[in-house]
Amino acid sequence: MQAEREISNGTLWAGRIIGGLPALFLLVDGAAKLVKPKPVVEATVGLGYPESVIIPIGVVLIICTILYLIPKTSVLGAILLTGYLGGAVATHVRTGESLFSIVFPVIFGVLLWLGLYLRDTRLRALFG
């Protein structure tokens, strides 16, 4: 196994910001699912999901995002969030949403992984 190379402060902070902004958005989205305001309920039901799954989806999203934000579990969190975002893409494709609605979760996934790559020596060692 290669020796871990040190990450510069600039790269570390760039990774924290690039990954942190979408993570913050996902935490807010998860919290909104727990509170269930009318627009969230309408949007979820409009995508073909019953209202009864909104809170469980919010809990899963918050847990996955917290795992992403904790350095020791960040890779697991990124993998789980990739699955979550893949489900979002599939939902938008299935319901015939706009291209933006389909690409938006993909962009989030790329930003999450890029942020993790910039701040995690294990991931950097894996990809050289």
List where the protein language model places each region.
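Membrane interfacial helix motifs at helix-loop boundaries and amphipathic/re-entrant anchors
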Residues: 36, 40-42, 49, 93-100
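Extended, low-polarity transmembrane helix blocks
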Residues: 1-28, 70-128
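Short juxtamembrane and helix-loop transition motifs at transmembrane-helix boundaries
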Residues: 34-46, 61-72
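A short secondary-structure junction motif
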Residues: 29-33
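Generic helix-packing signal
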Residues: 34, 47-48, 87-90
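Core segments of alpha-helical transmembrane spans in multipass integral membrane proteins
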Residues: 24, 28, 49-69, 83
